[in-house]
Regions:
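Extended, non-catalytic subsegments within catalytic or DNA/protein-binding/adaptor domains
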Residues: 1-199
Length: 199
């Protein structure tokens, strides 16, 4: 669940794009120095423009010397490596996300189940910090949070749209932009408080 959530919140990709990520050599490439990884989905995206076709996910390892003690535990590159190692013995599919229980053990995970993983991770994170989970939270909520935080930190709108596979900035401004510094339920995601910064 953790790696699914971290990829969702750091990439702003649709669940279909995350579900289509592959372990094939042409779709997953680690930086030689271990500083990051590039992943490509194995399907055609919803937005079929030259800009969005086969748009990769580029992840960079969090700085292990950061003053925030939890940063290393929230690093998507670290989590991805751990997940790949943990599923190596059961894997029956090149798809990145595979089932780890039930009759489909080791087989490709469905989009619906992947959505549940992300929602379960959010719910667990709130519970671990002693807070009730947001009502009506969806897997899609990660796209609003990820892109809104990016905008708040000065990332150009064109770069945000490219990462989220949106054809026009209007999609973000009308449907996804939220006030993550205010009372938006998921605004505190990946923003540790002093009470839970060591978890």
């Amino acid at each position: 669940m953790k790696v699914a959530f971290l990829l969702a919140i750091t990439s702003a990709k649709r669940v279909g794009e995350l579900q289509a990520l592959s372990m094939a050599e042409t779709c997953l490439r680690w930086n030689p120095d271990g500083s990051g990884v590039v992943l490509w989905p194995t399907f055609l995206p919803k937005v079929l423009s030259r800009t969005h076709l086969n748009q990769p996910i580029r992840l960079t390892r969090f700085d292990s010397t950061s003053e925030e003690g939890s940063s290393e535990l929230l690093c998507p590159v670290r989590a991805l490596k751990a997940y790949i190692a943990a599923t190596a013995s059961i894997r029956q599919s090149e798809q990145l996300f595979v089932c780890h229980d039930g009759p489909n053990w080791g087989c490709a995970l469905s989009k619906q189940r992947l959505s549940h993983w992300v929602i379960d991770a959010i719910t667990h994170a709130y519970g671990a910090s002693g807070r009730p989970p947001p009502s009506g939270v969806r897997c899609h909520s990660t796209r609003s949070v990820a892109t809104s935080w990016a905008a708040l930190r000065g990332v150009p709108l064109e770069a945000i749209c490219a990462a989220a596979s949106w054809a026009t900035p209007g999609t973000f401004t009308r449907f996804y932009r939220v006030n993550v510094t205010g009372h938006y339920p998921m605004g505190a995601v990946l923003r540790p408080s002093s009470a839970d910064s060591k978890e």
